[in-house]
Amino acid sequence: MTPAVTQTILTVRIARPHGYGYVLLSRGFSALNRPPPNYPGHIPLTTIERGALAVGSAIGSLLNPRRGDLIAALGEATATPYFIYRLRDAMLSDPTGRRILRDRPRISSKTLSIEYLRSLPPNTVGRTYVGWLDREGVGPDTRAPVQYIDDEECAYVMQRYRECHDFYHAITGLPVVVEGEVALKTFEFANTLLPMTGLSMFAVMRLKPAERERFWKLHLPWAIRSGLASKEVINVYWEEQLERDANELREELGIEKPADLREIRKMMRRQKAAEEAAKAKDGQ
């Protein structure tokens, strides 16, 4: 006799926006009964699956902060049900944010002409952006598509945040080293409230003692001060700001430019080399 196949159904209660609040909807999941995707590439998750994804990606990204795929998964797993809706609502309440949601622009090498950006005058936003890309050895095509956010519009909001991240780097001048990433993520947390950006602060534990001290004394106060004081950076239509003066845009947004971290690190290395050379000379 063929054994009966037992199917276990998990009922998930998820928050959906409704008017000025949220309503809870029940959704049945099983290995044989998964809802269809809401947009290309969408992967619906149960509450248990989302929790496992959040925990696993958090641990993995802490062990290896350079794993962008894990950081992206952590961002999506922890953004719902509230935080990504808050960010979407911030866009809806702003005229430029509403235009972005309507136009759905994407940032990639197909939508931005890198050669044109290199031709712009120094200190324009576009020239600053491409100069930062060249200096850090990265490109605009490294952002993975959103998969785990159920609401299609909110998925775009997360994609937009993700693709604008390098503009945040460029406008602040922070490099892609772990110290710079943690500083920028702290700024983003104060500005966007996305949990992943706040959780990224745990990567401070992986910094060297001197870097950790520099974060607490220099980067953290700057990030909180600028993140809270500045306008919502998700509402910047970067594609329309490329020819503007970068200092003018920073002033308009209320972003204080931090100390040049790469120059600080170079200075510290030179100082350490000089001290070691002096010790070696004294030992002769």
Swiss-Prot record:
Other notes: This protein may be expected to contain an N-terminal transit peptide but none has been predicted.
Enzyme Commission number(s): 4.1.1.130
InterPro entries the record matches: Coq4, Coq4_euk
Name of the top EC class for this enzyme: lyase
Residues annotated to bind Zn(2+): 165-166, 169, 181
Subunit structure: Component of a multi-subunit COQ enzyme complex, composed of at least COQ3, COQ4, COQ5, COQ6, COQ7 and COQ9.
Source lineage: Eukaryota, Fungi, Dikarya, Ascomycota, Pezizomycotina
Annotated compartments: Mitochondrion inner membrane
Metabolic or biological pathway, per its Swiss-Prot or TrEMBL entry: Cofactor biosynthesis; ubiquinone biosynthesis
Name used for this protein in its record: Ubiquinone biosynthesis protein COQ4, mitochondrial
GO biological process, one term: ubiquinone biosynthetic process
Role description: Lyase that catalyzes the C1-decarboxylation of 4-hydroxy-3-methoxy-5-(all-trans-polyprenyl)benzoic acid into 2-methoxy-6-(all-trans-polyprenyl)phenol during ubiquinone biosynthesis.
A cellular component term, taken from the record's GO annotations: extrinsic component of mitochondrial inner membrane
Cofactor: Zn(2+)
Chemical reaction(s) catalysed: a 4-hydroxy-3-methoxy-5-(all-trans-polyprenyl)benzoate + H(+) = a 2-methoxy-6-(all-trans-polyprenyl)phenol + CO2
Keywords on record: Lyase, Membrane, Metal-binding, Mitochondrion, Mitochondrion inner membrane, Ubiquinone biosynthesis, Zinc
Membrane topology: Peripheral membrane protein
Recorded family membership: Belongs to the COQ4 family.
Cystine pairs: none
